[in-house]
UniProtKB/Swiss-Prot annotation:
Coiled coil: none annotated. The keyword RNA-binding does not apply. This is Adenosylcobinamide-GDP ribazoletransferase. Joins adenosylcobinamide-GDP and alpha-ribazole to generate adenosylcobalamin (Ado-cobalamin). Also synthesizes adenosylcobalamin 5'-phosphate from adenosylcobinamide-GDP and alpha-ribazole 5'-phosphate.
Amino acid sequence: MIKAIRSAISFLTTLPLGGDVEELRKNLWLFPYAAILIALIVSVPHFIRNFVDIRFLALVLYLGAEGINHVDGLADFGDALFAPKNRKREAIKDLNTGAGGVAVVVVYFLLLYTLLYRSDFWEIALSQVLAKYSMLLLMLLSRPSWDGMGSYFMEKISSKDVFIGAVPVVLLCYKVGIESLAALASGFAVVLLLKAYSEKHFGGVNGDVIGSANCLTFAASLSALTIAGQL
């Protein structure tokens, strides 16, 4: 189990803990749990907000903790989103990032720059856990578009992973309160929309789409919590 935990943290963050991808495939339910560590790192600015520009620091810590793998997937998905209908599949497989991908990533960073400042630790933790949980749901509910990293994990995903992975989601929803319903709704909406769009245009889901689910759910959940908190 220790090896599986190290593998999850190493795969989902930039922390060089080693591990084995094959071991992670057997324990995909660890995704939401590893997200709590990312939330702790990203929340550091809230403890030193009187000394630094925490908006910029929070964004830097987020990228430092999670790395750019999922952001890279978001960029590829952004290229496909803006590509002509007959070239969407080609665009998401292209290794070069185009204007569409850059635009989507810039908007994503701007959202985080604003939202991380307005969110407390529990809201960030819930949003991070939901982001990873959305990856599990998308893998369970979808079919792979082609062979790759996405299909590699989707071969092993099971209802057990989704069930065990739901525990931190439930606990954090209880802690955050009624506003968590807005975050849950936004997360499920992202999963359903990505599934429908990807199966229509790509024939299924690949690693880039799964990575996009992480980014889009994180931003959508933070947005939903911010709006719900002001109502």
